[in-house]
Curated annotation (Swiss-Prot):
Family statement: Belongs to the IlvD/Edd family.
Organism from which the protein derives: Salmonella dublin (strain CT_02021853)
Associated pathway: Amino-acid biosynthesis; L-isoleucine biosynthesis; L-isoleucine from 2-oxobutanoate: step 3/4; Amino-acid biosynthesis; L-valine biosynthesis; L-valine from pyruvate: step 3/4
Protein name (database record): Dihydroxy-acid dehydratase
Entry EC number(s): 4.2.1.9
GO cellular component: cytosol
Length: 616
């Protein structure tokens, strides 16, 4: 029978000092036999996805205390990728994932907490907490802050839906008037919550649901809606049950590594492909799998991408649907229900509620459930009122979207495309693979061949795009922006947005060893591995080289013979200490980022730290 970890600090005369300190936090004698549950919050006023979380930790803590546990809350950092975008701040985004994972480990292990409730929401916070949870392998439940309502405004006598990406594109489009750009900017992000499309934050919160580590509705129920409060209340109660099951009944099924099994990871990736999620999810799932010591690799993702269709299409791939529409159509479990009927899921998995996947679908799939409370929950809709307050409205759709032929979520028969929303490409400069969000690629450019325009930083590429130096038919190559080379693997949302604003969204390709925002669409290929700074062949591409992209056949090729590539590699190596570094880039890199770069692996490994360099 496992012993409560917290007993290390609460029992025995030699822990009198620790108990004295616990008492100073408000604990009493009656608390020193109860499980100590860490409430891992991420409130900050910097991030709209986290600005409303201040009081939500208290909600969870009250339920933990009422259920027989002791709640202790702490906070992690949280970077807003949208605000950090387009300047040096983006270098810090991906490295913050590792800091978040480490900080959770440090706090939980230093104070011997028995379990966790993770209150996350945005891009690197959910992945960082997920990595920590699987590293620590103690009972955990995730409950995120929820999606933002979609922005709405009237343009040309028509009400349209908006999000952050629209504001960026219109702001950079010289054909858009100042008045219209200002109108879109003021309407794009109306409430608290994670940005309203199927961007990285919402993708990851959907995936924690598919992994079984969060409750039904977690990925899609709006941040502003009163129904979301119940997820927080339930999490506080349920975590105490899970904790006691493990420590008092020796039930290892309560542990995250037994819930988020390899089968669950495969289900999560299947969901991601079917819903056209952010390419960043590939990076984060690979990293989380390594923390769980699960053999889940790019090869597994490639196999799934070849058989899973696209059943859901959401912004930024279309402006017709946002997360509020996904929720109305049944949310994550609506998509999983269709995947299950198509025979594409592993059913031998459970979630934090203790339900198997078939049991969960029976209760929560809106096309089959008889539970009126569930149907009511999925009718939770937007209010259209600007607010930073959680649970501030109780509006509902008049009806559910259960149209699987022409609605937001489709059945296999009526899939948006036979191929899923993500694909892994391989070739002679992406030997370990690269990722493209096919959900955002126009059919006319699924096959594309053109001359390379090579840039050794995102900044240089943006300057060239806005300066008219990139023209129709070009393949923009941005390198030395990988985990090691950036360092930090910047998102390339500005280059892709500016290609659109210059009218080149369907006329050019963009390839990088960096990554893309979940808001990216177009022929944008990222995560090229190995990256340039690790000796990847992408470092050898020159202006004018022909690059051929063939998404249907999962191929990407630099059209040079092996002898020429070998000669260029030899010339690169001859640069000595300067080999595999950018030639003319002016970038100040802090000590903290250099430390990150010294251990960073390429994207095909999830950009995690290279443990082989640590010894032991």
């Amino acid at each position: 029978m496992p012993k409560y970890r917290s007993a290390t600090t609460t029992h025995g005369r030699n822990m009198a000092g620790a108990r004295a300190l616990w008492r100073a936090t408000g604990m009493t004698d009656s608390d020193f036999g109860k499980p100590i549950i860490a409430v891992v919050n991420s409130f900050t006023q910097f991030v709209p996805g986290h600005v409303h979380l201040r009081d939500l930790g208290k909600l969870v803590a009250e339920q933990i205390e009422a259920s027989g546990g002791v709640a202790k809350e702490f906070n992690t950092i949280a970077v807003d990728d949208g605000i950090a975008m387009g300047h040096g701040g983006m270098l810090y985004s991906l490295p913050s994932r590792e800091l978040i994972a480490d900080s959770v480990e440090y706090m939980v292990n230093a104070h011997c907490a028995d379990a966790m409730v993770c209150i996350s929401n945005c891009d690197k916070i959910t992945p960082g907490m997920l990595m920590a949870s699987l590293r620590l392998n103690i009972p955990v439940i995730f409950v995120s802050g929820g999606p933002m309502e979609a922005g709405k405004t009237k343009l040309s006598d028509k009400i349209i839906k908006l999000d952050l990406v629209d504001a960026m594109i219109q702001g950079a489009d010289p054909k858009v008037s100042d008045d219209q750009s200002n109108q879109v900017e003021r309407s794009a992000c109306p409430t608290c919550g994670s940005c309203s499309g199927m961007f990285t934050a919402n993708s990851m919160n959907c995936l924690t649901e598919a992994l079984g580590l969060s409750q039904p509705g977690n990925g899609s129920l709006l941040a502003t809606h009163a129904d979301r409060k119940q997820l927080f209340l339930n999490a506080g109660k349920r975590i105490v049950e899970l904790t006691k099951r493990y420590y008092e009944q020796n039930d290892e099924s309560a542990l995250p590594r037994n819930i988020a099994s390899k089968a669950a990871f495969e289900n999560a990736m299947t969901l991601d492909i079917a819903m056209g999620g952010s390419t960043n999810t590939v990076l984060h799932l690979l990293a989380a799998a390594q923390e769980a010591e699960i053999d889940f690799t790019m090869s597994d993702i490639d196999k799934l991408s070849r058989k899973v269709p696209q059943l859901c299409k959401v912004a930024p791939s279309t402006q017709k649907y946002h997360m509020e529409d996904v929720h109305r159509a049944g949310g994550v479990l609506g998509i999983l229900g269709e995947l299950d009927r198509a025979g594409l899921l592993n059913c031998n998995v459970k979630n934090v509620l203790g339900l198997t996947l078939p049991q969960t679908l029976e209760q929560y799939d809106i096309t089959v459930t008889q539970d009126e409370a569930v149907k009511k929950m999925f009718r939770a809709g937007p209010a259209g009122i600007r607010t930073t307050q959680a649970f501030s409205q109780d509006c509902r759709w008049d009806s559910l979207d259960d149209d699987r032929a022409a609605g937001c979520i489709r059945s296999l028969e009526y899939a948006y495309s036979k191929d899923g929303g993500l694909a892994v490409l391989y070739g002679n400069f992406a030997e370990n693979g690269c990722i493209v969000k096919t959900a955002g690629v126009d059919d006319s450019i699924l096959k594309f061949t053109g001359p390379a325009k090579v840039y050794e930083s995102q900044d240089d590429a943006v300057e060239a795009i806005l300066g008219g130096k990139v023209v129709e038919g070009d393949v923009v190559v941005i390198r030395y922006e990988g985990p090691k080379g950036g360092p930090g693997m910047q998102e390339m949302l500005y280059p892709t947005s500016f290609l659109k604003s210059m009218g080149l969204g369907k006329a050019c390709a963009l390839i990088t060893d960096g990554r893309f925002s979940g808001g990216t669409s177009g022929l944008s290929i990222g995560h090229v591995s190995p990256e340039a700074a690790s000796g990847g062949t992408i470092a050898l591409i020159e202006d004018g080289d022909t690059i051929a992209i063939d998404i249907p056949n999962r191929s990407i090729q630099l059209q040079l013979n092996e002898a020429e590539i070998a000669a260029r590699r030899e010339a690169q190596e001859a640069r000595g200490d300067k080999a595999w570094t950018p030639k003319n880039r002016q970038r100040q890199v802090s000590f903290a980022l250099r430390a990150y770069a010294s251990l960073a692996t390429s994207a095909d490994k999830g950009a995690v730290r290279d443990k082989s360099k640590l010894g032991g």
